[in-house]
C-alpha cells in the first residue's frame, strides 16, 4: 500500500495530473491544454484546394441542426449514410407496369457505431429536380413489410437546391434502426440520376443509450488500490478544494471550425483545485497530493472532421479528455 502511494504519480496519465500546476488556471491556460491534447491524437489538414471529383455532401444544409444543450453535446453525434446499392435508372423488366414508374429503391446498412446508439431523429435527402410536374402527386417515402409497400410517416419539404427533405416522425425511427432496411421514394416525374452529387443520403442524429452512465474502463490495478483512491484523505481539508470544473469551448475559438465541423462546441470537464498538505500518511511520506481525475473514469470526445472544405467527412476520437470524477491522489 505504501509503495502504491509512492507510485501513483508515475502511473497516472499526464492529462490526469494537469491540475498539479495550481488552482489559478485561467481560460487561456485551459484552452492551451485542450489544443495540445487534441493535437496529440488528431492532425489538422494542410491547406489545399477542394477535390472536385469527390462526392460532395451539401455541408451548408446538412450541418444546420437544432442547438443541443451543452450538457448533452458530448453524447450526441450525427451520421451521414449513403445507400449501399447503386441507383438503377433502367427498368429491371421490359414490361414494367405504369404504376412502377417513379419508384426509387435504396438499401441502407448503418454502421455498428450507429446501431449501438439511440436514434433521435432522421432525414432523407432526395434530389427531386428543378421542377415538379403539377400533374403528379407529391413525393413520398415507403418501406417494405410483409404486407408489401407501406408509407412511412415523414414530412416533406423542398430546398432551393431542388432537394426534397423527408423528416421522419418518431414512429418511423425504429424501422431506421435496423441492421439492414430499404426505403422507397415515390416521386413521379423526378429524374433518375446516378451522379454522385445527386445521390440520396440519410442524416441520422444519435445519442448514447439511456442506460445510465457510460461504462467505465477497467482499472489497471487491484481493487484494493482503487479503494485507496476512492477513500477520502486522512485530512478532510485535502479534498475540500478539489472539484470537477466545466468550461464551454467552441472550435471556432480554437481556430478549428473549418476542420472540426461537429459539434460546434463542447463542454470540457477537468479537475481543478489544490490538495492541502495533510498531517497523515501522505505528509509523513513526503508525497504531494494532486487534484486529478480518478483513474479509469476519463471519457473520450468524438468529433466529425473535414479535410477538403466539406466535400467529405470522417469521425475521429480524442481519447481520455473529459474528466468525470476528481479526487486527491
Swiss-Prot record:
Mod. after translation: Proteolytic processing yields a number of bioactive forms, consisting either solely of the mature alpha chain, of the most N-terminal propeptide linked through a disulfide bond to the mature alpha chain, or of the entire proprotein.
SMART domains, alphabetized: TGFB
Intrachain S-S bonds: 242-291, 271-326, 275-328
Residues carrying covalently attached carbohydrate according to the record: 135, 248
Coiled-coil annotated spans: none
Cellular component, GO annotation: extracellular space
Residue(s) at site: Cleavage: 60-61, 216-217
Sorted UniProt keywords: Cleavage on pair of basic residues, Disulfide bond, Glycoprotein, Growth factor, Hormone, Secreted, Signal
Major location (coarse): secreted
Classification via CDD domains: TGF_beta_INHA (cd13754)
Gene Ontology MF: a single term: hormone activity
Prosequence residues removed at maturation: 17-60, 61-216
Signal peptide stretch: 1-16
UniProt-annotated location(s): Secreted
Gene3D superfamilies assigned: Cystine-knot cytokines
Protein biosynthesis listed as a keyword: no
Top-level lineage group: Eukaryota
Function: Inhibins and activins inhibit and activate, respectively, the secretion of follitropin by the pituitary gland. Inhibins/activins are involved in regulating a number of diverse functions such as hypothalamic and pituitary hormone secretion, gonadal hormone secretion, germ cell development and maturation, erythroid differentiation, insulin secretion, nerve cell survival, embryonic axial development or bone growth, depending on their subunit composition. Inhibins appear to oppose the functions of activins.
Quaternary organization: Dimeric, linked by one or more disulfide bonds. Inhibin A is a dimer of alpha and beta-A. Inhibin B is a dimer of alpha and beta-B.
Family named by the database record: Belongs to the TGF-beta family.
PANTHER family, per the entry: INHIBIN ALPHA CHAIN, TGF-BETA FAMILY
Protein name: Inhibin alpha chain
UniProt source species: Gallus gallus (Chicken)
Encoding gene per record: INHA
Amino acid at each position: 500500500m505504501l509503495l502504491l502511494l509512492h507510485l501513483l504519480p508515475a502511473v497516472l496519465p499526464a492529462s490526469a495530473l494537469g491540475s498539479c500546476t495550481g488552482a489559478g488556471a485561467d481560460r487561456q491556460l485551459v484552452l492551451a491544454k485542450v489544443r495540445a491534447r487534441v493535437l496529440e491524437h488528431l492532425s489538422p489538414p494542410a491547406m489545399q484546394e477542394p477535390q472536385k471529383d469527390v462526392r460532395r455532401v451539401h455541408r451548408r444544409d446538412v450541418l444546420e441542426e437544432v442547438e443541443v444543450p451543452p450538457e448533452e453535446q458530448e453524447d450526441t453525434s450525427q451520421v451521414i449514410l449513403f445507400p449501399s446499392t447503386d441507383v438503377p435508372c433502367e427498368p429491371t423488366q421490359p414490361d414494367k407496369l405504369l404504376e412502377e414508374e417513379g419508384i426509387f429503391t435504396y438499401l441502407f446498412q448503418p454502421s455498428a457505431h450507429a446501431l449501438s446508439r439511440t436514434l433521435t431523429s432522421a432525414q432523407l435527402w432526395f434530389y427531386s429536380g428543378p421542377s415538379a410536374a403539377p400533374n403528379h402527386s407529391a413525393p413520398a417515402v415507403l418501406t417494405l413489410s410483409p404486407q408489401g409497400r407501406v408509407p412511412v410517416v415523414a414530412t416533406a419539404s423542398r430546398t432551393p437546391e431542388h432537394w426534397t427533405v423527408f423528416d421522419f416522425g418518431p414512429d418511423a425511427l425504429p424501422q431506421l434502426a435496423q441492421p439492414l432496411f430499404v426505403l422507397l421514394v415515390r416521386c413521379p416525374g423526378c429524374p433518375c440520376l446516378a451522379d454522385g452529387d445527386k445521390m440520396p443520403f440519410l442524416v441520422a442524429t444519435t445519442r448514447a443509450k439511456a442506460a445510465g452512465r457510460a461504462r467505465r474502463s477497467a482499472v489497471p490495478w487491484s481493487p484494493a488500490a482503487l479503494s485507496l483512491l476512492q477513500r477520502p484523505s486522512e485530512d478532510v481539508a485535502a479534498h475540500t478544494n478539489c472539484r470537477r470544473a466545466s468550461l464551454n469551448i467552441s472550435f471556432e475559438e480554437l481556430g478549428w471550425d473549418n476542420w472540426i465541423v461537429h459539434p460546434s462546441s463542447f463542454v470540457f470537464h477537468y479537475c481543478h483545485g489544490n490538495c492541502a498538505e495533510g498531517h497523515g500518511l501522505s505528509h509523513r511520506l513526503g508525497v504531494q497530493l494532486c487534484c486529478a481525475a480518478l483513474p479509469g473514469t476519463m471519457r473520450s470526445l468524438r468529433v466529425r472532421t473535414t479535410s477538403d472544405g466539406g466535400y467529405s467527412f470522417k469521425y475521429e476520437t480524442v481519447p481520455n479528455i473529459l474528466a468525470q470524477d476528481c479526487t486527491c491522489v
